[in-house]
Amino acid sequence: MANVKFQVKKGDLVKIIAGDDKGKTGKILSVLAKKSQVIVEGCKVAKKAIKPSEKIPNGGHINKEMPIHISNVAKVEE
């Protein structure tokens, strides 16, 4: 696959233009270039189960941002 340039990068402020979180704005936490997806702070939050470990002896649930396709976000000019 060829190197693809995206119009957005980590730290940019973007607005969600499609999907369940349409209209929300947030900062990009990371860009997944190979999948053409971005993770936006506070958008598309899912509850994930955590197995017990030394850090979290009881396990539990956490809220985690899930990736959004790059075509569903638009850069917001500040």
From Swiss-Prot:
One of two assembly initiator proteins, it binds directly to the 5'-end of the 23S rRNA, where it nucleates assembly of the 50S subunit. InterPro entries: KOW (IPR005824), Rib_uL2_dom2 (IPR014722), Ribosomal_uL24 (IPR003256), Ribosomal_uL24_CS (IPR005825), Ribosomal_uL24_KOW (IPR041988), Translation_prot_SH3-like_sf (IPR008991). Part of the 50S ribosomal subunit. The gene is rplX. One of its GO terms (cellular component) is ribonucleoprotein complex. Belongs to the universal ribosomal protein uL24 family. This is Large ribosomal subunit protein uL24. The keyword Ribonucleoprotein applies. It comes from the Bacteria. It comes from Campylobacter curvus (strain 525.92). Keywords: Ribonucleoprotein, Ribosomal protein, RNA-binding, rRNA-binding. Pfam families: KOW, ribosomal_L24. The keyword Ribosomal protein applies. GO terms for molecular function: rRNA binding; structural constituent of ribosome. GO terms for biological process: translation.
